[in-house]
């Protein structure tokens, strides 16, 4: 074995981090970055700069390089691809040895892959498009505490999508009035009601008062309907200690499910709360507040499919995924891609849906996809077709905005859902025949008829900012 010697100075990154003949190992963590280099910086130079800075490189040679095996620990840029329709940027594929990352810590993965490298001067913009987590790493993560089947068993609800409602106005209600709004929606036919992500413990409604009034409403609705009900009690808090205090109280008063903002609250807090839920038999509903800051710019940030994978590893039984048809951003093909990444046990590479790598989840359970944001009864046929059964449809204004009140709005949504599920099961093309299906159901439901009349002109037709960059969509 040759003796390694130290030579001070600066070595070009490409001498160590560009390896186009590298065949990624099954145990490698693979990343796809979209890189927009600075003028005058060629593609290879930009790619290897990202590979070095996100693994074990630094700007100059250091003598401590001799104390380790950099050839093993380094990230390797192994392939570059054009971005269809955009010659200002390119895709760089980088392989990282699994030993660079702490087992079961998505926090540590993000510290390296979306850390200082995103401020690197060699690149004008940088976006993490996708990650392939090797099964050896997946098995070190906790994942969803319950999973889809366990949640259905807890709720005794099968064969259809679940229905929910975010209570509005999202800020300003007293705890007692808030509980009343929950009760009306639950007795009308919803499975869940939900705290808005903005609701924590403000002066107009402290968290303990809200929890107590809401659980009184849940239990009363259960007694009247004979169905299992729930409310997503938001335990997101200023500190982890306060978060666990709120979670413990939710458990004490019989709540089956709690809620956490996993990006605003932090990945470390989310993983800890998921472990607590696993140990205490609770369901964690996860909201994605803050995601658009990270994922909406098509050239810089983190794609939501990556945030979806991170959540599944970190732990959550529900995740908001967008609606395609509602008021929030979301391309249909991309949305279907990250919904599969959330729910399926194996998802193959599929560039038509923006999936750059095969992803094997092993035995890790999946989670419910949650559609929320500007949806109403007219969207029901499309939502059932797009999302499938293992989903939760959250109608906020589409429930509480009904002219006859919350219970009528909930009833209208339940009738519309059951009509669409029945039509689908009969083999009908529910997206094409949606108007006919809903109109027929409304003949027996005045609540649905009024809802259809109220929102018949409401559409959210805006161009998607983050479009799939594929050659043949």
From Swiss-Prot:
The basic functional RuBisCO is composed of a large chain homodimer in a 'head-to-tail' conformation. In form I RuBisCO this homodimer is arranged in a barrel-like tetramer with the small subunits forming a tetrameric 'cap' on each end of the 'barrel'. It is an enzyme of class 4 (lyase). Pfam families: RuBisCO_large (PF00016), RuBisCO_large_N (PF02788). The active site is at 168 (proton acceptor), 287 (proton acceptor). The modification N6-carboxylysine is found at residue 194. Its EC number is 4.1.1.39. The gene is cbbL. Substrate binds at residues 116, 166, 170, 288, 320, 372. Heterohexadecamer of 8 large chains and 8 small chains. Belongs to the RuBisCO large chain family. Type I subfamily. Its cofactor is Mg(2+). This is Ribulose bisphosphate carboxylase large chain. It catalyses: 2 (2R)-3-phosphoglycerate + 2 H(+) = D-ribulose 1,5-bisphosphate + CO2 + H2O; D-ribulose 1,5-bisphosphate + O2 = 2-phosphoglycolate + (2R)-3-phosphoglycerate + 2 H(+). Mg(2+) binds at residues 194, 196-197. The keyword Oxidoreductase applies.
